[in-house]
C-alpha cells in the first residue's frame, strides 16, 4: 500500500482518470463507478473547478480516487478525493481551503474556497494569508 498524507483513513474503491473526473465535475453529472453513482456537487469537490494545483506550493493533483471514510460505518458514501503523487509514491491529499477561515467569519461558498494540499492547509490553519503572506513556509 502506498503511503498517504491526509487527516483520516479511507477505503479506496479505485481510481478514476483525472480528465474523466474533471469532465463530470464541469458537466455536474454523477460518476458511474463499479456499481456506485459518485456525486460531484459538494462545495468541497466543486473547489477544484478553480484548478487542481495547491494555491500555496503549486503541487498539482495527479489522480482522483473514489473513496469513503474508513470508520466502519456502512452509511459512509463514496466520494472523490484528489491526490498529488510524489516520485516516491507517497500520495498527498488535495483539500478545499477556506481563504477567509470559517472560524473568523468566512463564508461557505465557492468564492471563499481554493485548492490546497493537505500539508499547506494544515500549516495555514486559521491564518488569513493575504494579511500575512509569510505565515507559512512551503516544504523544500
Spans of features found by a protein language model:
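A boundary/linker detector
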Residues: 1-53, 58-65
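Histidine (H) residue identity feature
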Residues: 6, 10, 24, 36, ...
